[in-house]
């Protein structure tokens, strides 16, 4: 039996689960359990080899790996949240915080590239934070080496998340380092604006096509970015042969400007000041009027190699007053009916699927458990944007009558 006591599931995907765990001495960690039938041993060993070799203050710490009857397991240090969940939809991060996290992101990626490793799935959802608020880059399931037998090699397998993938990745032959730079550039746009500039960097995408035509960032959300930062975004999203290395990005005047949150080592100087810049989440009225099919299988697409971590953008817990489980489930269904959200009951869960304000699929489940002083509803995001999920949960909570003193809404931290 492994020395780790597996606890609640924080996230699950098609090939693996991430579970909270306790190590000897009651140290907190997470264990990614990969089903053997779904992932070849060589892929697991590659991820372990890469992650084990990394030592950087802005990269989530590798702890251990093992194999048991349940699957291949990777043990990592426990994060305290997710950068993606701190980003306000349509508003982004506070400018000081956006610069702080971008500096730390580029530092981590520069370290990776210095070891001839490219990440291939850089996005805010793969950026955790530690207890001091520092960024921790995570998810190395798609990572690979780009220097082999003394020669730089071009990569050919598409990997990553569509919105953050460089155009050449869709074409089938690309430089892994420069593809990471592109993903960092798109992440910077999200940091600054709270919105994605396009759905995918291909000619058929109207917003991307407009960006390529203008090269001036005249469309939303790019139009809201300052000139100096926008100049950097444009350089990072230039054609592959004109795109700078991450080391060059690190020397950019916008990146190098002083930041009161950073100490001499590039870590957070004042955690209280940092967390004061994170806006408290408030409810936002949304209309979910065009439900999708409940749990319809999405079209095949490159996605994150690991299940999405259940950070504060993935799980919402709603604590309500005295009620039976049956009544609580009925109230959930009635609330979803009122929101015109497609749903179905599966045992003690309600599965739901709808479209958000960006016309993208948002789906998940609502579970109910009985507590000593009432019921707890756990709303879990399966697919969709973290910020849209937060808005959805606020509207659902209000529909459940949870805007009074009897209800408490908490977003999970991992």
Curated annotation (Swiss-Prot):
GO terms for cellular component: cytoplasm; nucleus. It comes from the Eukaryota. The active site is at 121 (proton acceptor). Residues 291-310 are annotated as: Disordered. Its EC number is 2.7.11.1. One of its GO terms (biological process) is intracellular signal transduction. ATP binds at residues 10-18, 32. Pfam families: Pkinase. Residues 4-255 form the Protein kinase domain. The keyword Acetylation does not apply. Gene3D superfamilies: Transferase(Phosphotransferase) domain 1. PROSITE patterns: PROTEIN_KINASE_DOM (PS50011), PROTEIN_KINASE_ST (PS00108). Keywords: ATP-binding, Kinase, Nucleotide-binding, Nucleus, Serine/threonine-protein kinase, Transferase. Serine/threonine-protein kinase which is required for checkpoint-mediated cell cycle arrest and activation of DNA repair in response to the presence of DNA damage or unreplicated DNA. May also negatively regulate cell cycle progression during unperturbed cell cycles. PANTHER family: KP78A-RELATED (PTHR24346:SF82), MAP/MICROTUBULE AFFINITY-REGULATING KINASE (PTHR24346). Belongs to the protein kinase superfamily. CAMK Ser/Thr protein kinase family. NIM1 subfamily. This is Probable serine/threonine-protein kinase CHK1 homolog.
């Amino acid at each position: 039996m492994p020395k780790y006591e597996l606890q609640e599931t924080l996230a699950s995907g098609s090939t693996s689960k991430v579970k909270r765990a306790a190590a000897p001495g009651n140290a907190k960690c997470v264990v990614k359990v990969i089903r053997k039938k779904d992932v070849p041993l060589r892929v697991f060993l590659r991820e372990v080899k890469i992650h084990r070799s990394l030592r950087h203050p802005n990269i989530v710490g590798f702890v251990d790996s093992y194999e048991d009857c349940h699957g291949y397991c990777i043990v990592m240090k426990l994060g305290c949240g997710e950068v993606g969940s701190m980003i306000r939809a349509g508003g982004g991060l506070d400018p000081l915080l956006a610069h702080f996290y971008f500096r730390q992101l580029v530092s981590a990626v520069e370290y990776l590239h210095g070891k001839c490793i490219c990440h291939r799935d850089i996005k805010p959802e793969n950026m955790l934070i530690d207890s001091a608020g520092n960024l921790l880059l995570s998810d190395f399931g798609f990572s690979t080496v780009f220097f082999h037998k003394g020669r730089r090699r071009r990569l050919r397998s598409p990997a990553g998340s569509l919105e953050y993938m460089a155009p050449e990745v869709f074409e089938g032959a690309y430089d892994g380092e420069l593809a990471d730079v592109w993903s960092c550039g798109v992440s910077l746009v999200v940091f600054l604006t709270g919105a994605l500039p396009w759905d995918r960097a291909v000619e058929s995408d109207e917003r991307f096509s407009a960006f390529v035509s203008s090269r001036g960032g005249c469309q939303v959300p790019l139009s809201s970015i300052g000139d100096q930062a926008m100049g950097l975004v444009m350089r990072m999203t230039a054609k592959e042969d004109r795109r700078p290395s991450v080391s060059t990005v690190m020397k950019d005047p916008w990146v190098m400007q002083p930041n009161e949150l950073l100490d001499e080592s590039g870590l957070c100087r004042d955690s209280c000041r940092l967390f004061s810049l994170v806006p408290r989440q408030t409810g936002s009225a949304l209309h979910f009027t065009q439900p999708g099919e409940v749990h319809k299988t999405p079209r095949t697409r490159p996605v994150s190699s690991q299940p999405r971590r259940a950070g504060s953008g993935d799980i919402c817990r709603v604590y309500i007053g005295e009620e039976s489980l049956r009544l609580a489930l009925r109230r959930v269904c009635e609330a979803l009916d009122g929101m015109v959200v497609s749903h179905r009951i599966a045992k003690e869960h309600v599965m739901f699927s709808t479209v958000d304000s960006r016309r993208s699929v948002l789906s998940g489940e609502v579970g109910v458990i009985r507590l000593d002083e009432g019921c707890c509803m756990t709303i879990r995001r399966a697919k969709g944007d973290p910020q849209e999920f937060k808005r959805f949960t606020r509207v659902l909570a209000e529909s459940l009558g949870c805007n009074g003193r009897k209800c408490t809404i908490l977003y999970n931290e991992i």
